A protein has these predicted regions:
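Residue-level signal for threonine
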Residues: 19
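Short, isolated positions in well-ordered beta-strands
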Residues: 14-16
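Extended, low-hydrophobicity segments enriched in charged/polar residues
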Residues: 53-56
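Short active-site loop/helix that positions an aromatic residue
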Residues: 23-29
Length: 110
């Protein structure tokens, strides 16, 4: 599964990816991965532009829109972006290392 997508455009290479921080910003802006199918006209542009935030935060919306409009296989692109987004969310719950030596533990108490 892809962690990044690279897009060459007008002599520049754009690296698209998501981080916990960019995912959080997207959610605060109203993005919901669960609404991707029911509100595609809103959520797909938010998903695509959100992927620029980690490495290209100052890219203008007009440039992002031109890049998107010129790309082929948009269904494949949106699928890959959605998987990358979801992977970033899952890092909040994943145990990075099975070896927990030295890491704090937790316990539920009554």
């Amino acid at each position: 599964m892809a962690k990044r997508i690279e897009i060459p455009y007008n002599g520049k290479k754009y690296t698209l990816e998501f981080t916990r921080s960019t995912v959080s910003s997207m959610e605060k802006s109203g993005f919901s991965i669960n609404e991707l199918g029911s509100k595609p006209a809103t959520m797909i542009p938010m998903l695509f532009s959100g992927a620029f935030a980690a490495n290209h935060p100052s890219t203008k919306v007009a440039t992002i829109n031109k890049i998107y409009d010129g790309l082929g296989d948009k269904q494949g692109l949106v699928k890959a972006l959605a998987e990358m987004y979801s992977d970033s969310v899952y890092t909040l719950l994943a145990d990075e290392d099975e070896d927990s030596e030295g890491n704090p533990g937790w316990e539920a108490v009554e």
